[in-house]
């Protein structure tokens, strides 16, 4: 019988898709290629959709995840979730209604992680800073670092409560002066240097490495 490699489904928004990284295709694609250097290493499925928030990911994750086991009875052994930035955006003005208010976001994330965690291993990578001087995005959406920080803290609480590994990225990036040059001109997406930084953090994330090698 042929032994299949493990599969890791990476699901989320444009960050997973790799938007902004014209050199390496994004942190997820960089990780896929890096892991692909080992013939027996896990296979990464990259399922990022631009504009997705917690509600859209919640509606599609199970079908997407379950259909990538490569054989009829097999299911991917883990999910890496990266979502939330789009939910933080205020509509119309800086103090406008959020795409999803923070309490609704926390509730939605709790449900989503609980569903995922009942079927497979779950890892969470959180948010990245924005360039507030470039707002509004698309003429109507206001992203701010205060919003990102608040939503990321809620994400951490949910992950801690459900014993799910999370990789905090916002505060580390925000405190790094170089990161101001790692955001594209639209103000919300990382450029190639930013994606490379995320890739390096994931590559050295001990708990993900242990899962990969187990």
How should these model regions be labeled?
Residues 1-50, 54-56, 62-75, 79:
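Serine-esterase "nucleophile elbow" of acetyl-processing enzymes
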Residues 3, 40, 58-214:
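Alpha-helical cap/lid subdomain in secreted, periplasmic
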């Amino acid at each position: 019988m042929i032994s299949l490699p493990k599969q890791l489904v990476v699901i989320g928004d444009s960050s997973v898709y790799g938007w902004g990284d014209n050199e390496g295709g994004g942190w997820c694609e960089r990780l896929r290629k890096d892991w692909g250097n080992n013939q027996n290493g896990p296979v990464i499925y990259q399922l990022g959709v631009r504009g997705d928030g917690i509600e859209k990911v919640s509606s599609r994750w199970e079908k997407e995840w379950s259909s990538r086991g490569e054989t009829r009875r097999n299911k991917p052994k883990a999910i890496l979730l990266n979502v939330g930035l789009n939910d933080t955006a205020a509509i119309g003005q800086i103090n406008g209604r959020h795409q999803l208010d923070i309490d609704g976001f926390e509730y939605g994330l709790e449900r989503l992680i609980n569903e995922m965690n009942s079927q497979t291993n779950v890892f969470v990578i959180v948010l990245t800073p924005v360039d507030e001087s470039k707002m509004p995005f698309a003429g109507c959406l206001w992203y701010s670092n205060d919003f990102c920080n608040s939503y990321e803290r809620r994400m951490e609480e949910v992950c801690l409560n459900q014993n799910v590994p999370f990789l905090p990225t916002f505060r580390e990036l925000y405190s790094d002066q170089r990161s101001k040059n790692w955001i594209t001109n639209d103000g919300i997406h990382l450029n190639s240097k930013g994606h490379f930084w995320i890739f390096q953090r994931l590559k050295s994330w001990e708990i993900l490495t242990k899962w990969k090698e187990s």
